[in-house]
């Protein structure tokens, strides 16, 4: 069957907080002049959580939907936010909740921290890296060769206290090649050179950085240091919808601010093969090769350059998203050719299949999921 499009490896989201992604973009500005940096944003990530609107606009909407004390709709909410990724061609995503429910963690997108490809040696640390943090599981995993990736929020801000978190990493012997350093907005050439020396990785979320801090990571210095870079959206309160959307922000920043230091091929690698290599998944996904998992996205041909084609593509240009050989979303003609009538109408000529018989809540339809969440999000 001719897809009438271009086939790519599925996009990989290397940094998110998926359980917050039923919330809309958070409209705010620094609430204290003493916490405002020269770019008009916050000095560090520990300040904006104290904004008076953070709880009612970000935390409470998430808790009301997910928590068992309220609507207890974690299954519906997680399926919804994973579909937001899938319609943009994402096939794997980092940052799912730690509840570990089969109703969502083993279906739809690959949840990176869970068991995948015969192993689960991937660790995440979101909280502050304190000076007494030992991290023996990281050290032993690195020494044994079993560690696949360590996702670490670090140096998120613009002040010296943010930059100094990197010093703790070095002093505590935690600067390892499996590190996926998330944000790093405070880092300079000095730190990126050290990260590059060990073969470390950077996860860049330009939109969230710009909205929260007024500027973003020095990816030019990271590139010069040989650091492998991935692009990811962070979360919906201050980030974009998916890597496909974040790719456009990164491309605009590269063109307008950096002087086009990344070519189109390099940009596309940041959402496909770079993430796969950064967590030792490259023998399974990230490129299209015989024997690899069939995590694929088909995009309409809107540009003759296949790499620019992805950068310019929007959700409606996604003709098909396949995860592990299973078609999940796409144009109705392709979904019908591959699945018969086993799908739901998703509007705009698209089809979606979120049902997985054999897992908890696997019979929930897309119509039911949306209806439940619309009711819950009224906050009556």
What are the language-model segments listed below?
Residues 1-8:
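Active-site metal-binding motif and surrounding structural segment of the metallo-beta-lactamase
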Residues 85, 195, 202, 247, ...:
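Conserved, mostly hydrophobic/aromatic
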Residues 95-240, 256:
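Active-site core of metal-dependent hydrolases
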Residues 10, 84, 194, 221, ...:
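Hydrophobic/aromatic ligand-binding patch that stacks against planar heteroaromatic rings
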Residues 16-40, 44-127, 139-143, 269-380:
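Active-site microenvironment of metallo-dependent hydrolases
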Residues 172-178, 215-303, 312-327:
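His/Asp/Glu-enriched, well-ordered alpha-helical/loop segment
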Residues 191, 198-200, 226-227, 255-261, ...:
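Charged catalytic cores and adjacent phosphate/nucleic-acid-binding surfaces used
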Residues 10-23, 149-157:
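Histidine-centered catalytic micro-motifs
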């Amino acid at each position: 069957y001719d897809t009438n499009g271009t086939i790519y490896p599925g996009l990989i989201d290397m940094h998110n907080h998926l359980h917050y992604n039923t919330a809309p973009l958070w409209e705010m500005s620094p609430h204290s002049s003493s916490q405002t940096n020269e770019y008009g944003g916050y000095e560090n990530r520990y300040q904006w959580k104290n904004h008076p609107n953070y709880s009612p606009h970000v935390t409470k909407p998430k808790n009301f939907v997910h928590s068992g004390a309220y609507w207890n709709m974690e299954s519906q909410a997680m399926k919804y936010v994973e579909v937001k990724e899938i319609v943009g061609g994402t096939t794997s995503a980092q940052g799912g909740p730690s509840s570990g429910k089969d109703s969502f963690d083993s279906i739809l997108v690959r949840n990176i921290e869970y068991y995948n490809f015969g192993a689960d040696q991937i660790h995440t640390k979101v909280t502050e890296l304190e000076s007494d943090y030992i991290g023996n599981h990281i050290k032993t995993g690195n020494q044994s060769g079993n560690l696949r990736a360590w996702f670490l929020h670090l140096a998120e801000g613009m002040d010296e206290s943010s930059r100094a978190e990197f010093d703790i990493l070095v002093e505590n012997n935690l600067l390892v090649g499996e590190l996926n350093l998330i944000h790093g907005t405070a880092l300079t050439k000095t730190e990126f050179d050290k990260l590059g020396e060990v073969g470390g990785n950077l996860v860049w979320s330009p939109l969230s950085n710009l909205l929260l801090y007024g500027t973003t990571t020095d990816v030019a210095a990271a590139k010069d240091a040989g650091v492998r870079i991935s692009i990811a959206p962070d979360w919906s309160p201050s980030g974009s919808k998916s890597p496909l959307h974040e790719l456009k922000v990164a491309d605009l920043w590269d063109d307008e601010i950096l002087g086009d230091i990344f070519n189109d091929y390099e940009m596309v690698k940041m959402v496909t093969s770079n993430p796969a290599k950064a967590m030792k998944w490259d023998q399974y996904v990230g490129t299209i090769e015989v024997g690899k998992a069939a995590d694929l996205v088909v995009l309409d041909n809107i540009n003759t350059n296949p790499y620019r084609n992805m950068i310019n593509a929007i959700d409606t240009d996604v003709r098909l998203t396949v995860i592990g050989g299973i078609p999940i979303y796409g144009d109705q003609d392709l979904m019908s050719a591959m699945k018969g009538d086993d799908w739901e109408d998703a509007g705009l000529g698209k089809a979606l299949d979120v049902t997985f018989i054999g897992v908890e809540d696997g019979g929930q339809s897309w119509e039911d999921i949306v209806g439940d969440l619309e009711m819950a999000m009224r906050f009556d």
